[in-house]
Regions:
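Helix-to-loop junction immediately C-terminal to a conserved catalytic motif
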Residues: 60
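Conserved ABC transporter NBD signature motif
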Residues: 68-77
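Conserved ABC ATPase "signature" region
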Residues: 76, 123-141
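Conserved ABC ATPase signature
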Residues: 145-153
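Hydrophobic anchor residue at the start of the ABC signature
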Residues: 159
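Conserved catalytic motifs of ABC-family nucleotide-binding domains
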Residues: 166
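Catalytic Walker B motif of ABC-type/P-loop ATPase nucleotide-binding domains
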Residues: 170-173
Length: 225
């Protein structure tokens, strides 16, 4: 399918996906249907549990789906080989629940780490770093090491790192799980700002305060599990 045709379809489409609990006859989810479209802010909400991490693993290609269940721009991901999966993952920015920062490195080096992996020039790295830190208003912490940061500061760094390489979409997996209400609002504001910068956002959360706050500030799609 030509790229211009694919633009009309969702970035991610899940169709009738069923997954079972290990060693159980109980389904984790049954005939799940989900879409993530370009430019949208989608919130996946539900109780904490294994289902959300399993859903993310399918979307990022860590778990291989059955044929005709998970699609990227209408390409059946069941047919992706290892190289296809690696190229696809480069198009995703991920904000992890536990940050996944390198504690010995500075804030800057953590944020630009994806660019280093792609062997970008120093000039390009500096320009992208300056742009993202200004837009997210985190210039004040850029010379610190990550081991000295608070939880919400670490999550701000993680969001900047997820955005630095201009991904097709960002997955934020429970980004406020250990934050108080005020810090939760700040993270919500950063995700809203990321969406305004034309980033497609998929937020996974069980935090109803975060859900209500983001809903009050911007248009969202809500997917309940």
């Amino acid at each position: 399918m030509a790229d211009n045709q694919k633009e009309r379809f969702p970035l991610i489409a899940i169709k009738d996906l069923t997954r079972w609990y290990p060693d159980s006859r109980e389904p984790l989810f049954k005939k799940l249907n989900f879409e993530l479209s370009k430019g949208e802010f989608t919130i996946v909400v539900g109780k904490s549990g294994i289902w959300k991490s399993t859903l993310v693993k399918f979307i990022i290609g860590q778990l291989r789906p059955y044929t005709r269940t998970v699609y990227y721009k209408m390409d059946d991901m069941a047919h992706f080989n290892d190289e296809d999966v690696q190229q696809y993952r480069r198009k995703i920015g991920i904000v992890f629940q536990d940050y996944k920062l390198i504690s010995s490195l500075s804030v800057k080096e953590n944020i630009v780490y994806p660019l280093r992996l792609e062997n970008e020039s120093d000039n390009s790295i500096q320009a992208k770093y300056r742009t993202i830190t200004q837009k997210l208003h985190i210039e004040d912490i850029n010379k610190l090491t990550c081991k000295t940061l608070s939880g919400w500061e670490k999550q701000k760094v993680a969001i900047a790192r997820a955005m630095i390489n201009d991904p097709e979409f960002i997955i934020a997996d429970e980004p406020t799980w250990n934050l108080d209400r005020e810090c939760t609002k700040e993270i919500g504001d950063l995700l809203i700002e990321a969406n305004k910068m034309w980033n497609t956002i998929m937020l996974i959360t069980h935090d109803m305060n975060l859900l209500d706050y983001i809903k009050s500030k911007t248009k969202v799609n809500i997917f309940k599990m």
